[in-house]
Amino acid sequence: GGPIIPELGILCSPRGVQSRLSSSHPNRVRPGGRPVVTPAPVIATRGDESWALACPGGDVIVQAVAQVMWRVMTTGASLQEAVEAPRFASFNVPSAFHPHPSADRLVYTEGGINEREREQLRAQGHHVEVWPNFEFDAGSVQTIRSAPNSQGERVLTAGADPRRLAYGLAR
């Protein structure tokens, strides 16, 4: 559940609080509006392959999912290797959650990101903070892929993120 506005008798969903009351804001509350909210599940397909990803993590969701997809597609990492790889997250834009804080040029990196890469971020003007490895706040990507093997048989593979309690099960 979410907060209750007793004077109006309205129960706000946890994601409903991501809307804005300012009439000029693109994510304003309005009749028929389609508010932007942070959940961002992904289904990707190519030929006989299909791939699904999802992640809890508020403002980090899209960043975490994109990093996992990038690792799989560009480095050939397995799904499990990709979800376990160190992450970074930017907090430069206003948070989706009230009171919508932002931190100019703030980037958090997990401990597994090497110091040389952190120095490169600092050289570009970022303020870099280091999270421990497998930081809860870095999101928790769960993923499963269905693809044919060399014999044309369907094979399911999964990745379960150790940052939170997660399992990869398929049938």
Predicted regions located by residue number:
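Proteins synthesized as precursors that undergo proteolytic processing into mature forms
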Residues: 1-134
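In a subset of proteins, long, contiguous C-terminal domains/tails are tracked
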Residues: 115-171
